[in-house]
Amino acid sequence: MNKDLTVGKPSQVLWQFCLPMFGSIIFQQLYNIADSLVAGKFIGENALAAVGNSYEITLIFIAFAFGCNIGCSVIVSRYFGAKEYREMKTSVYTSLIGSAVLCVVLMGIGLLGCDALLELINTPEEILADSALYLDIYVLGLPFMFFYNIATGIFSALGDSKTPFYFLAVSSLSNIGVDILFVAGFKMGIAGVAWATFLCQGVSCVLAMVVVFRRIRAFHTEGHVQLFSWNMLGKVAVVAVPSILQQSFVSVGNIILQSIINTFGASVIAGYSAAVKLNNMVITSFTTLGNGISNYTSQNMGAGKMDRVKEGFGAGRNLVWLLCVPLVVLYFFFGRFLLLLFMNDPQGPAIDTGMLFLRILSPFYFVVSVKLVADGILRGCGLMVRFMIATFTDLILRVGIAAVLSATALGSTGIWMAWPVGWCIGTALSMVFYVTAIRKALAEPLAVAEAEGQAAEVRAEAEFAADAEMETL
């Protein structure tokens, strides 16, 4: 079902649109959490550390898939909001072809270079072989991840957040069962964990793509629809490339952090691996709402309803704060019970490390959630430079502070303390950019977009605004 995000009360529209997206991202996170949970419970602490260590490298591939998702989603959303269905179809087909080429290149790089990267980040010898095996199988499944992300981006652009939720719910729950079957039943070890994810993501991807093509063909268009357009690829790339660079930069920063953490041994790696999975569920949920706001913003820009963009920020902020309250209480006071899902020793150094991580970070969810809402609007408006500056500043500070403090008497605790500092400064920057840029965008959308180098999209935005003004007159 397609949904028009340009009408209705913003808070209600965002809630109805984003609620299934929250469910989808929770099930998406269950893929990696299930891998860690089964590895830790049925194989051992070293297996948990191996999956967690590999996860930071997989984030590089996820960054490219996520960037393709955002680029496709924003452009498709804009044409859908403007009712220009022929261009919308061309943007869909172009995004799929471009993503396929990128995926093939990344598979080659991954299969040839992951082993060297594992050694570069100080992976302990006792988990090196398992980490390499997990990554090799993961890379083989990249096409499934890429095309599924493109599919979800298209669904979101059309205002449909329920369809991907249904696919992921079934696939993620199946993944848990297949994980246990392969590891506990067939005794496949770490390979069983990876192959289970490969299989279930493949099923989810195929189903999603079938529905996407049916949905797109249902739109009536006149004239020839191009299957590929270099001009359209350029428009998608204007949004996708900054997102890919931003996410890749974040991934590289996380890999540097992982290399610092690896110097403290397998127990600290295991504790961090479990805790960061819980943390990522929260951050990814906030990011998902930000993505929803990006689609909301883009559709309303396409329809020339810039006043609704500003209203979307307040509605989004209130939604994430409602989520923060129970999550902070749960992680701060009851995090140990959640960590025990991943490990068997309730008193060991691994669980103590994870609990300290959660207690340091969780109170600052109220801060970083605001940043991610503001970032969503900046992306939806095409103000990618501002978005990237705020994100890069956060990460650079986090890595730098972690490197310095970890070398002091604080040890690994100093690494965890770096997160809140980076979040606070990054949020301040995002808010400054949001307040200044969105005011200019409301008054002079053409000038702001040109200042950001979005020349191709500026003309379309100007036409949308002109049409809206004529309707008002």
Predicted regions and their residues:
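Short alpha-helical transmembrane segments in multi-pass integral membrane proteins
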Residues: M1-C18, V76-G141, G185-V241, T297-F364, ...
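Residue-level signal for short hydrophobic patches within transmembrane helices
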Residues: S11-L30, A34, I57-F64, L140, ...
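Transmembrane helical elements of multi-pass membrane transporters/channels
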Residues: Q16-D35, I137, Y148, S171, ...
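Helix-terminus/linker motif at the lipid-water interface of multi-pass membrane proteins
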Residues: L30-A49, L118-E125, L181-M188, S248-K277, ...
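Interfacial/gating helices of multi-pass transporter permease domains
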Residues: A39-L59, E125-D130, I190-A191, M232-V239, ...
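Small-residue-rich hydrophobic transmembrane alpha-helices
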Residues: L48-G108, M145-P164, G271-G335, V368-A390
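Hydrophobic transmembrane alpha-helices of multi-pass small-molecule transporters
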Residues: I60-A63, N175-I180, S204-M209, M281-T284, ...
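Short runs within selected transmembrane alpha-helices of multi-pass transporters and secretion channels
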Residues: N69, Y138-S156, P164-N175, V193-V206, ...
